[in-house]
Curated annotation (Swiss-Prot):
EC number(s) on file: 4.2.1.32
Superkingdom in the source lineage: Bacteria
Lineage: Bacteria, Pseudomonadati, Pseudomonadota, Gammaproteobacteria, Enterobacterales
Keyword line: Lyase
Cross-referenced Pfam families: Fumerase_C
One Gene Ontology term of the molecular function aspect: L(+)-tartrate dehydratase activity
Recorded family membership: Belongs to the class-I fumarase family.
Protein's name according to its UniProt entry: L(+)-tartrate dehydratase subunit beta
Length: 201
């Protein structure tokens, strides 16, 4: 059965979700990447949209005007780790509950997700056009002076996903755990290979 989160998301909605779970989002998803994070955390500029209980997407979309409305053409995730130095404070200050992006995030985001009850989730890379089909409407846009990729596009989405949980509210970090596991598996294999191919060195 599909696990669907609907905004506004509450802390109790997230307590039973664990890393490696697959979930979907219905409701409000706001594109929000480097400059937005810097403006809030470094420049202390308030975000012109209430993110409390909502979801953000580390993404720089392609949109087009259709009459008096905006239409999503393509919206793929950008590398979440670029926002690592800001994300803990960002979660604390905004009350955002779902951070969608590409790849994992680090210990600061882990701490933020655990302390302030949020999730980091991964949207599959290479599926930007598919993601755009899950955007029902662009309801608002803010900070357009930043250009299309960095503007805040407030989207209404339906069953947006699949989203793989990479950090949960209990401090678990799927990507960090996998790196350790892969290293443990890799080292003895590399040693064995080196015994047979030492002449290449």
């Amino acid at each position: 059965m599909k696990k669907i989160l609907t905004t506004p998301i509450k802390a109790e909605d997230l307590q039973d979700i664990r890393v490696d779970d697959v979930i979907y989002l219905t409701g409000t998803l706001v594109t929000c990447r480097d400059v937005c994070h810097r403006r809030l955390i470094e420049l202390k500029r308030p975000i012109p949209y209430d993110l409390n209980g909502k979801a953000i997407f580390h993404a720089g979309p392609i949109v087009r005007k259709n009459g008096d409305k905006w239409e999503m053409v393509s919206v793929g995730p950008t590398t979440s780790m670029r926002m690592e130095s800001f994300e803990r404070e960002f979660i604390e200050q905004t009350g955002v509950k779902l951070v969608v992006g590409k790849g994992g995030m680090g210990p600061l985001t882990e701490e933020g997700c655990q302390k302030f009850k949020a999730l980091h989730v991964i949207f599959p890379a290479g599926c930007a056009v598919l993601a755009a089909t899950q955007v029902e409407e662009i309801e608002e846009v803010h900070w357009t002076e930043l250009g299309m990729p960095e503007s805040l596009w407030v989207c209404r989405v339906k069953e947006f996903g699949p989203l793989i949980v990479s950090i949960d509210t209990h401090g678990n970090n799927l990507i960090a755990e996998n790196k350790k596991l892969f290293a443990e598996r890799r080292d003895p294999i590399v040693e064995e290979i080196c015994e047979h191919v030492h002449y290449i060195k």
